Amino acid sequence: MTVFLSFAFLAAILTHIGCSNQRRSPENSGRRYNRIQHGQCAYTFILPEHDGNCRESTTDQYNTNALQRDAPHVEPDFSSQKLQHLEHVMENYTQWLQKLENYIVENMKSEMAQIQQNAVQNHTATMLEIGTSLLSQTAEQTRKLTDVETQVLNQTSRLEIQLLENSLSTYKLEKQLLQQTNEILKIHEKNSLLEHKILEMEGKHKEELDTLKEEKENLQGLVTRQTYIIQELEKQLNRATTNNSVLQKQQLELMDTVHNLVNLCTKEGVLLKGGKREEEKPFRDCADVYQAGFNKSGIYTIYINNMPEPKKVFCNMDVNGGGWTVIQHREDGSLDFQRGWKEYKMGFGNPSGEYWLGNEFIFAITSQRQYMLRIELMDWEGNRAYSQYDRFHIGNEKQNYRLYLKGHTGTAGKQSSLILHGADFSTKDADNDNCMCKCALMLTGGWWFDACGPSNLNGMFYTAGQNHGKLNGIKWHYFKGPSYSLRSTTMMIRPLDF
């Protein structure tokens, strides 16, 4: 307030004593009014004024920026009086200002108190609002901080658990690493020992190789000499075999001549020594040939009941006691077994090689007496096996040469690859199987297929290396599987009472 009044007083003095070369109006002589606006309050000051007019300085000895004077201009020799007058005027102004200040203070007390009270009330209301807002914001922030704290605690707990798990895993890994390190060290030690042993073995092996090289050279010389000897022996054997074949042929021709002579003598009624007529009994099968004293495997002539002509067959006198009549043989694929019904009926091929005896002859032979069947098998690795049946016979042509078997044994599988309950014979031109697919056309050859079945010894012949994965080959399922084509097969029969 004091500063404000000081500014007001300064403004009044400047207004009062300024020299502007303007004349005052008559109504304003002796007094001067000054109005000051401060906020909502307006203050009017009445300032006394000295009689006389301000003179304008005409001399250059005074400052050009000098203020207008209240007293009339006098000459310089009256300067002391002027100063006294000014001092007196200043004292009056000072007293007047003190009175004015006291008046303003007295009159402004109530207004200032009211203003302060209003300001305090407004400030209090504002502070209350601000406080309320701060409290609500503080509560909201506190709630958020609580949530954040909860989340932080939960996250911290999870992190602690995870850290603990990681610590356990790290401990386990360290333990495993330590164990593996120990094992690696042990293995390294073993490797060192093995390397040492290997070096020793290499030295010994080198010595042995040198020895073997010497022995190999000696053996090669020996093999060369033995090869020459073997070749000479083979030549001798071939010559002996040729001679033997000639002798066998001569023997067969001689036997045929003897049989013809016997038959001729029987028909002409020739009497033998002692005057008795003896009827010659022909060979019904190879068992009769064997029992007659012929125990060498080869081709013999037999006389089958109800057949108009004799039949040449191959007799196996070596396997399981001999006396076997061969009815089928495969060995080199030189004969085509994809034949028709009539050919399988009467037979085809050469008894000394690959051949089929003929269904009509097999039926006639097995109708004479009870027979057993033996099947010899060999694969391309040289393994041999057999299947044997205690009872074997087939029906006539009207019965489609139906197969009848009983009592299976042997090494070519625990189960029989032939149909035991009976199956009709089928060829490419006579489909008698139990399948819509015509097994004889699909699997080739003539056989007792039933529903194509697990065997076909008259199938296509495949050479070594091409015998795998062949469903239409020479197969015996329970020996080598359904798609392995065998190297050789032999089917032969012998009387049960042999």
UniProtKB/Swiss-Prot annotation:
Subcellular location(s) per record? Secreted
Relate the outcome reported for changing residue 225 to C. Answer: In HAE5; uncertain significance; does not affect oligomerization; does not affect interaction with TEK
Q: Which cysteines are joined by disulfide bonds?
A: 286-315, 439-452
What is noted besides the main data? It may have a potential therapeutic utility since it can be used for specifically targeting tumor vasculature or for promoting angiogenic processes in certain organs such as an ischemic heart.
Q: InterPro entries recorded for this chain?
A: FIB_ANG-like, Fibrinogen-like_C, Fibrinogen_a/b/g_C_1, Fibrinogen_a/b/g_C_dom, Fibrinogen_CS
Which organism was this protein described from? Homo sapiens
Q: Tell me the first and last residues of the signal peptide.
A: 1-15
Q: Which SUPFAM superfamilies match?
A: Fibrinogen C-terminal domain-like
Q: What is this protein called?
A: Angiopoietin-1
Protein keywords: Angiogenesis, Coiled coil, Developmental protein, Differentiation, Disease variant, Disulfide bond, Glycoprotein, Secreted, Signal
